[in-house]
Amino acid sequence: MRKFPFVLCVIFLILGLLACGAQPAGPDMTTKEETAMLKAGYARVNITPDYGVPMSGYGNDAVRISSGLKSFLFATCVAFSDGEDTVLVIQTDLSQADINVVNEVRGWVKSKHNIPMENVMIAGTHSHSAPTVSGANASMEYRADLIGWLEEAAGEALADLKPVTGIYYGNQNCPNLNFVRHYTTEAGIIKGDGLNALVESPYTGHTHAADDLLQIARVDRQGGGSIVMANWQSHPHRSTSESDKELSSDIVGVMTQYVEQEMKDVLFIYFTGASGNINPHSRIEAENITKDYKEQGNALGKHAVSILRGEMSRVEGTNVQVCTSAYVAQINHEDDHRVEDAKKVVEFWQACYDTDQTRRVAYTYNMQSIYHAQRIIERSYMGVTQQIELSAFSVGDFGFAVAPYEMFDTQGVTIREESPFQATFVISCCNNAYGYIPSMEGFENDTYEAYSCRFKPGTGEALADEFMSMLGQLHTTK
């Protein structure tokens, strides 16, 4: 009888200890990074029209209707998902992205796959031998077809999501494959390719050396089918003359074919970098340059394969993050007198356009002056400011800055070199089409990209700073 209370005490003690063990152990401090299972998906869809369409170029008044085919055009999509957040980037063999097309596709992805609209990004390779999708000349039939094809690419990439076993990064300088298209002359004048190509004195050099760094990322996946991403800065090679009416994926298509044939089990996607002032050819180094888009694409492909077969650095991390910013930029308005002068120039040119006087007008004003006058008038009808949607995302320790405009190479270098991430791609011509936004050097050199820009000088540098802030924000929370 005397032992019973002791036995009860022991039992109650054991039950108490068990009860304590069953209590919550405090908050779960496991991070998203530690639990994420990164997956990547890929898809490629043919977006070549089988009918004649207006083609993109330099905004020429003459409309080129396609009548032939050099190579097929594609939309290529890569998707990344960590189980919580998903991002899709669709690269198209088109000049640029049209915001209305982008929003249609974003809306479809959101409704079908519950992915936020800002997590869907659509870019152009900036091909000048592709259908135009913006403005009055665009084919509405092609736009409708394109939207369906882009939705198809997004859906297929999401269906293709497979576990990532590793991401690897490498780069290589590619001399004589791109050039800054602004030149100094013996007369101390800055000239450029395009509308101000007439020169009063011989060229003496480039305003600065081009950013010739080719970046490559390889995303290995469970079961094979590695995704290879390339980031290179250059305008296309193909002509935009009135006689050139053949559709072409240009340098990108040739580079894609070369890499996939050489490396076999890889899936290639190309992103256009900061190339607003970069061409694939030079007026003063003709003996060193590639002669056409096929030679250019194969040369870049060889560099890419060299990187892939060499030693690449493993990129750590598995989480996916997206950041957006609505930057308010100032419109570069001219005074009333400049606007009136511009109207007189355009009126005179239009009166002589397509007549025997066209050549005389070109010599009177030169095409650069006419182009400049047109832009001055356009800006006079704009408001004081315009909002520019910037995007950035990260996959582990890999950052991506997504620009809806043609960025100059110096801004791209700044973002890449000052980014807190192990590696950073700059993707231009993505999500919208704000045209050129030059560096301060571009404005000071008085080139046609500066004439074309609707925003005030200094906007390019301010946007680069904004991208750095966005990448910093992503890096601190990765």
Please provide the spans of the model-predicted regions.
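Bacterial N-terminal signal peptides that target proteins for export
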Residues: 1-8
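Small-residue packing motifs within transmembrane alpha-helices
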Residues: 12-15
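C-terminal motif of bacterial Sec signal peptides marking the signal peptidase cleavage site
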Residues: 17-19
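Bacterial lipoprotein signal-peptidase II cleavage site
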Residues: 21-27
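Conserved beta-alpha junction segments in alpha/beta enzyme cores
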Residues: 29-123, 131-267, 271-284, 288-298, ...
